[in-house]
Amino acid sequence: MSVSLIVMGAAGRMGSILARLISEAPDLTLAAVLESPGHVDKLNAWEAGGTRVETDPAVAMTALPGAVVVDFTAPEATMSTARLAAAHGNPMVIGTTGLTDGNKAELSELAKRVPLFLSPNMSVGVNVLLEVLPEL
């Protein structure tokens, strides 16, 4: 069974890497890529390949119920997307840095309505270090 994913900020550094890796994974489906209207032209290759390209997260979530939203954007965009995801019932993975304590408290409340995974530091080096530290 394939998991459908929606990648927010797909023209950005992390978003573009994630979109590529998801598209190459046999058990994942890149259902949609999103970007702000000023940057959506950078996603033409995805659209040509058959992936849905959107500028409005609500449109993507309505069209793709249950798809997991992956967000590595900016705090304000992440919070807006998280509210929409909770309202539409889309699970969410958040890797955005710079979230305030207030943002995190709101995300905790939203997580009562929809599965939500938050890890603002998903860099390979940090995760390898965290894995190795207990063995030292």
Residue ranges and their predicted role:
Residues M8-R20:
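N-terminal Rossmann NAD(P)H-binding glycine-rich loop of SDR-like oxidoreductase domains
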Residues L30, V53, M92-V93, L116-L118:
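Hydrophobic beta-strand scaffold residues
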Residues W46-L64, V70-T78:
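Glycine-rich, highly charged phosphate/nucleotide-binding loops
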Residues E76-H88, G95-S119, V124-L136:
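Rossmann-fold NAD(P)-binding glycine/threonine-rich loop
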